[in-house]
A protein has these predicted regions:
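WD40-repeat beta-propeller superdomains and closely related acidic/aromatic-rich repeat-like regions
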Residues: 1-342
Length: 342
């Protein structure tokens, strides 16, 4: 006897196979059964559309707003430029990190990120500070400069008011902050910190809240928060990946890796982590996805060159069908199923 809904099952299998066979698949629409499905190559971003030359030195990081209307760029010169993406005109030029007295060689901005509602932009700098700016009018919302080592990364929670910050300071490696400041605590500036992970420390007569984690000293190279705001993942300079429950603020897992970690990202559903690692012996970038709960490696992408610089990657495309990675070979690599289209 033919199973119930057998025809529907077969037709669904045909649609799934057409998606798998589509090299440039970049749509969330269900393929039609009336014609063979194939996304056009010309609809895939393979060519340079414009060049932005307002940075005066190396560009270290860029980020699009969630609605795609803005692009923020940052780099070695300490500038943060925000462009509108229709005509690619600058709408803001932020110089907050230039005003730090650390000197021109220590003012580089290594990370920027828009809040989920695109109201705020956080920037992290080598001059040991982070700044949150209001994208609408350009005014500074909050700032923290109490760190003794560079601030390397940040990630927003869904409420667009709280965010986590990772630094290379063993005293303040990982913290949860809010844009709503509190002047209590006797610190040198308003206290925007809600919670911190790391070794015990005190500020004046006040002991800041710490977790009960026993990870010892660590320094953070990158940090990511799941889209639902329940989990956080951090990559450290001693090649560890640590995940945390942001509700209980307790550590969930820790996985030791072989070499230097340069970036980490959650997939949209939070089930995967995308990890970049610098294989120093081979001068190659290693890029793979892993189960965010078990740490099991699921897929590896080969081909990116990495020796000296920080290489980052992210999920991209409709339905996150692709992995996009930088490369020291001056290539942007789009990986769909383990191969590289460069």
């Amino acid at each position: 006897m033919i199973p119930e809904h057998r025809l529907a099952t077969l037709l669904s299998s045909v649609q799934e196979q057409q998606i798998l066979n589509c090299q440039y698949h970049n749509t969330t629409a269900t393929p039609s059964l009336y014609t063979d499905h194939e996304c056009a190559e010309q609809d895939f971003p393979l060519h340079t559309l414009t060049q932005l030359k307002n940075q005066t030195d190396e560009v270290w990081f860029l980020a699009f707003s969630h609605d795609g209307s803005l692009l923020a760029t940052a780099g070695k010169d300490g500038l943060v430029n925000v462009y509108e993406t229709t005509r690619w005109k600058i709408v803001h030029e932020f110089r907050e990190h230039e005003r730090n007295g650390a000197g021109p060689d220590a003012r580089g901005v290594c990370f920027v990120a828009f809040s989920p509602d695109d109201k705020y932009l956080i920037s992290c700098s080598q001059n040991c500070e982070f700044v949150v700016l209001d994208v609408r009018d350009g005014h500074m919302v909050c700032k923290a400069d109490h760190f003794d080592y560079p601030v390397t990364a940040a990630a927003w929670l869904p409420d667009s008011l709280t965010f986590v910050v990772g630094t290379q300071s063993s005293k303040d490696p990982l913290g949860l902050y809010t844009v709503i400041g509190s002047t209590s605590g006797g610190g040198p500036s308003p206290n925007y910190e809600i919670h911190s992970w790391g070794p015990p420390r005190s500020d004046g007569n006040r002991e800041r809240e710490r977790d009960r984690d026993t990870s010892g000293d660590f320094r953070v190279t990158d940090v990511a928060v799941s889209r639902d705001g329940t989990r956080m993942a951090a990559a450290t300079t001693d090649n560890r990946i640590m995940t945390y429950d942001l509700t209980s603020r307790e550590k969930l897992c820790e996985w030791q890796q072989e070499d230097k970690l340069t970036s980490i990202n959650y997939s949209a559903d939070g089930t995967l982590l995308l990890v970049n690692m610098n294989d120093t012996e081979m001068n190659m970038g290693r890029l793979w996805t892993m189960d965010s709960t078990t740490g099991e490696e699921l897929m590896r992408f080969e081909g990116a060159q990495q020796a000296e610089f920080v290489i980052r990657s992210c999920f991209g495309g409709a339905g996150e069908n692709f992995v996009i990675s930088g490369s020291e070979g001056q290539l942007s690599c789009d990986s769909g199923s383990g191969g590289l289209d460069c």
